[in-house]
Amino acid sequence: VMKYTDVWNDLTEKMGYWVDLENPYITYENEYIETLWWILKQFHEKGLLYKGYTVQPYSPAAGTGLSSHELNQPGTYKMLKDTSIVAQFHLKRDQDHPLMDKVFENAEEDTVILAWTTTPWTLPSNCALAVGASISYVKIRTFNPYTFQPVSVILAMDLVSKYFKEEHKALPFDDYKAGDKVIPWNQVADFKGSDLVGLRYHQLMPYVSNADLEKNAFRVIPADFVTTEDGTGIVHTASVFGADDFRAARENNVPSVMITDEKGNELPLVDKQGRFVQEVSDFAGRFVKEEYYSDEERKDPDFRPTDVLIAIKLKEDNKAFDVKKYEHSYPHCWRTDKPVLYYPLDSWFIKTTAVKDRLVELNKTINWKPESTGTGRFGNWLENLVDWNLSRSRYWGTPLPIWRTVDGAEEKCIGSVEGLRLEIKKAVAAGFMDASFEINDMHRPYVDDVILVSKSGKKMIRETDLIDVWFDSGAMPYAQWGLPPTAEGKSGNISPEAFLEYWNKHTGSDSEPGSIYPADFIAEGVDQTRGWFFTLHAIGVMLHDSISFKNVVSNGLVLDKNGNKMSKRLGNAADPFETIEKYGADPT
């Protein structure tokens, strides 16, 4: 980690960057990590730290979940051309529903509900179809454009013109022949979304089924996020791969399409590498996103993305009504540049929404330059705040300082090295730890060897997650100093106010005490409004109801010759070592 310290120190001096090179803070040192633990313990005691099972942004390429502020870094959303599908969900005849006479007007009629998706790989996990209760829907008699079979389709009235031409309306059905480009259609019924709720349909891609799914899934549910801006006005719902889907399914008691492993754990149909599981037999082992394949694999003339193969299968099975390429903005991992998935994970969260109003209020006291960045980009971000996903499934970084019993009924959050050693002594007395064990490094794997004892005498194992590196950054105003070398400080029982009081007293002089917090001034690029600026602000407000900086200058981004953001990762940045050598520090 410190291999190039001398090189960077030399560059820093040439740039004239005013910083203490003799006493840097180093985020991997125990003293720094210990202070992060202390902050997290403060949050835990305030009820701001919790574990939840939710659908979150997840990067298969990086192997970890991502926070909302990571997903909103500049350049993370990129335009992609993906295969979109309007799928046909065939309604069941053997059901008791008030609309049955309108849905099926004769014994031969095949009636389907149309739902659009830009993520065909989620279709095997479909568990429900969501409608807007007040939206107007219609039933249209027509023919499937791929199988040429007669079909009656249900979709939103406002979106009929996306799929049907007015001049083809009411043309003679008897004149239609398989393969004709002109497809006749006719509206034969209309409904409100609330009328459709409860209708049941056949599972679209029945790779996984069980009694609970058959009884409680594959039905129409109401949802407040359904619109008629695009698609069909009916939302394909895969509860394990979308936050809105997850919420809507839970509110309507719809089970998720999952498999069960040998330990009894429920798992989605896509693994954490982004591949279909074996149960999805037609596509087992295939990556769900084209970008997860290597460049070499994608150059193969026979290569076809999984979404395309799904579209082909649905066409063959008379379950696709419209397939085309669709260009849209899609989130990518800021570390790997690969698309993310929305994925169900057990994660630890910081409840930033609990202090949202205070974050907004205190932001108005900060002097932003330009002001529009503070009121606009940063202010809007705070107004739409979600809880901070703290967990990271990685090996190197700051470990989460929480130990839990296997049943999850008891937990401890450790706030210092001394506090951990005291808990280890209790575990030794309980027979869970060897008396000779010493903790000298707070990283994995050493910290994972620590077993603690609960109040009821049960074993407690550390939660295996690390914490978001942006927490490391946002905690810098405190962690750069470490816990005060007092009994109260070393035990981790010091209050935030006492922490600042101690370091203010010991960083100045007798005649002029120091003032370590809040910072008088910080400066960074506009991309940090949802990065460092946010984490500084959030931690400061949650820890002791204060801003972290009084003044901030937020500059724009230096772009390359093509107008793209310069990035070390992309290799399009000007090399400062070369430019300083050639032109000197000032021009650079």
Predicted feature residues:
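Conserved core architecture of multi-subunit DNA-directed RNA polymerases
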Residues: 6-13, 34, 38-42, 70-72, ...
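Metal-dependent nucleotidyl/phosphoryl-transfer cores and adjacent nucleic-acid-binding surfaces
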Residues: 43, 80-83, 132
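Non-cofactor substrate-recognition interfaces
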Residues: 1-22, 101-107, 111-113, 120-588
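Charged, gly/pro-enriched flexible loop segments at helix/strand junctions
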Residues: 51-59, 394-400
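Gly/Thr-rich phosphate-binding loop signature of adenosyl cofactor/nucleotide-binding cores
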Residues: 47
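Active-site cores that bind ATP or allylic diphosphates and position pyrophosphate for catalysis
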Residues: 57-114, 122
